[in-house]
Amino acid sequence: MKKTLYQKLFDSHIVHEAPGEVPILYINRHLIHEVTSPQAFDGLRVAGRQVRQVNKTFGTMDHSISTQVRDVNKLTGQAKIQVLELDKNCKATGISLFDMNSKQQGIVHVMGPEQGLTLPGMTIVCGDSHTATHGAFGALAFGIGTSEVEHVLATQTLKQARAKSMKIEVRGEVAKGITAKDIILAIIGKTTMAGGTGHVVEFCGEAIRALSMEGRMTVCNMAIEMGAKAGLIAPDETTFAYLKDRPYAPKGKDWESAVEYWKTLKTDEGAEFDTVVILDAKDIAPQVTWGTNPGQVIGIDQKVPNPAEMQDPVTKASAEKALAYIGLSPETDLKDISVDQVFIGSCTNSRIEDLRAAATVMKGRKKADNVKRVLVVPGSGLVKEQAEKEGLDKIFIAAGAEWRNPGCSMCLGMNDDRLGEWERCASTSNRNFEGRQGRNGRTHLVSPAMAAAAAVFGKFVDIRYMELN
């Protein structure tokens, strides 16, 4: 039987399957952070259970921590409790933890790949919805709830129903200035935020293959935003080059054996997908969301849609509600929308290539007077170190931006970095839901270059026509 990549990964990890029952999968890698793990460890203690595979579980601190201080004693409230609990739980169980004093610390979906913890062919879970990021390596990776975190800690397995398979093919080459973020936003705009529900998506096509691993991670990161269980990209030479010599990647003969196996991780020719979506890369413009979900997105050269022209009553009602919240009128030109804040960071766009793209735009320029704050938050200590080695921090600071320590930051209103009421933000994060970046905050999702351009011009501009330094 010819199989898709997803089917190969799923079937190779089944440890038990009985008629009429949901299969049980073996989990190769479990990543944890301070927000969704405390109750899971409490559950283990109450039941008198141990962590089954300590060497397959790794922790970091990212969601609730401050990006301004590195001292846990200077944290307050829930953030301090969560960080101390994770530290205590990891020490008690022997789990490796990249804490706030480690330069390996970072956003869990940035830290995992750069350490080589993410490898092709693995099953990877984390108590975080954007675990799909790791699918960029040809791994079956998905987010789980806290009760499932406890189950994986105790058994290194998880009950998991089979999903449908979806292929999204992006044919041809993108135009100059078009990034992975634009590609995935365009995909979600076409499929809608529910288009992938019940599916695991495999991204393919020339435009996907041309992406770096960092770009591929951006694409898979947002698979969940189209309702998919996970996103996948088959591994290739780009994948292997990225992973070679990473701290936790195989070494020597083990590396050679691993690569031989990884080369088999691809969809068989003639395998059938349940759903197929095709996009032409040349049609993708820089993307900007106009509403309150990632599927409400258009090209920078378009105008805000008019709900009155929408035929579907549900879509129409959603658009009307979104425009009322976001404070925009139908037919508004995106290039007429000014912003109050800019956020460059998150597990979607905080890697070194993202920061380089933003710095290229901001070099020699200053943030616009109407922009109150520009936050640039690297995804890990290693990204921060590399950026500073290249002088990117100096470019951002000279432009009037704030250069911060690693963390999830303003992606979500769970820490000190958030929007004021009704402030509008150009953000490189992955969700533009109501209140996501702070109470009544208004979020527009864009690429790092587009966010940087909004910072220096004070409004959205078409990056394709900018003179870059």
Curated annotation (Swiss-Prot):
It holds the Pfam family Aconitase. The keyword Amino-acid biosynthesis applies. PROSITE patterns: ACONITASE_1, ACONITASE_2. GO terms for molecular function: 3-isopropylmalate dehydratase activity; 4 iron, 4 sulfur cluster binding; metal ion binding. [4Fe-4S] cluster binds at C347, C408, C411. Its cofactor is [4Fe-4S] cluster. Pathway: Amino-acid biosynthesis; L-leucine biosynthesis; L-leucine from 3-methyl-2-oxobutanoate: step 2/4. Binds 1 [4Fe-4S] cluster per subunit. It comes from the Bacteria. Keywords: 4Fe-4S, Amino-acid biosynthesis, Branched-chain amino acid biosynthesis, Iron, Iron-sulfur, Leucine biosynthesis, Lyase, Metal-binding. InterPro entries: 3-IsopropMal_deHydase_lsu, Acnase/IPM_dHydase_lsu_aba_1/3, Acoase/IPM_deHydtase_lsu_aba, Aconitase_4Fe-4S_BS, Aconitase_4Fe-4S_dom, IPM_dehydratase_rel_enz, IPMI_cat. Its EC number is 4.2.1.33. Gene3D superfamilies: Aconitase, domain 3. GO terms for biological process: L-leucine biosynthetic process. CDD domains: IPMI (cd01583). It catalyses: (2R,3S)-3-isopropylmalate = (2S)-2-isopropylmalate. It is an enzyme of class 4 (lyase). Belongs to the aconitase/IPM isomerase family. LeuC type 1 subfamily. Catalyzes the isomerization between 2-isopropylmalate and 3-isopropylmalate, via the formation of 2-isopropylmaleate. Heterodimer of LeuC and LeuD. This is 3-isopropylmalate dehydratase large subunit. The gene is leuC.
